[in-house]
Amino acid sequence: MENHTQDDELKAHLLRTNEQFRSFAEQHAQLKKQVEEIESRPHVTEADEIEEQRLKKQKLHVKDLMNEMLEQQRHASVG
């Protein structure tokens, strides 16, 4: 549980102090919103499904970049 709190604090710190991390977080939120919009449609076309997969991959890539920055910050804090 303590690790989760430390991660939350680290994310909050990066959101306040790191413009690149903040940009990634905003991109991730926007991509999540776009995916949810497609998923909420009553009828999803093949083009919608392709777009949804593209957005999900992009969202995952941004999340990976954020996690990489968090990991770098963890090491900087320890070292």
Which residues make up each language-model segment?
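Extended, charge-rich alpha-helical interface modules
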Residues: M1-G79
